[in-house]
């Protein structure tokens, strides 16, 4: 009996070329395997930096943000308030992306972010007074696939001010916020940030009077992502 030998040459993962002693070449399919090589290759192709994929395709879990913004707020007499209160405002905030991109395949695809904001300002009308506040926010960043990343958020926190009657009467106030805006990325991890929003100040009846202060604000600044 004559024994035939077959030599195998690996040409790529998933197939091989077999050559018999008679010179015939046979292509064989190999079953896929979960080898260390394949796992290492998959690992090295994972995205790096702040993005889950390309720029604008959503943020990676754990990405942090630092924002510095300035602007103003125009008051209006509504919901019981008797005066329009106008402010010059500054804000610094820190954020953290809670998880992976959600809503894949839908227009609302994006990331949830928690933020802590410290803001301060000077009331310029109807009188000169000060205002400071600390507010946690829940923000949603839309993954558009472009350098324009819109967002929307809600916040509720505490404030201190020396604004007095007729609309407030105590130093301690709560603040409620609803905001929307956009990040425009100048480079991979730095964006211009513009936002507009509504802010309400009142003490929930702890002091009297408690008519409340209502404003519409606009802020412009920069945000670092890391």
Model-based region annotation:
Residues 96-98, 140-142, 182-184, 224:
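Residue-level signature of outer-membrane beta-barrel architecture
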Residues 54-63, 98-112, 126-128, 143-149, ...:
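Short loop/turn motifs that connect adjacent beta-strands in outer-membrane beta-barrel proteins
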Residues 1-56:
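Cleavable N-terminal export/targeting peptides
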Residues 92, 213-226:
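Outer-membrane beta-barrel "beta-signal"
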Residues 66-74, 114-120, 152-158, 194-198:
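Transmembrane beta-barrel strands of outer-membrane/channel proteins
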Residues 62-64, 84-90, 128-134, 148, ...:
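Residues that define the transmembrane beta-barrel architecture of outer-membrane proteins
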Residues 72-90:
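Surface-exposed strand-loop-strand hairpins of Gram-negative outer-membrane beta-barrel proteins
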Residues 73-79, 101, 119-125, 141, ...:
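Sequence/structural signature of outer-membrane beta-barrel proteins
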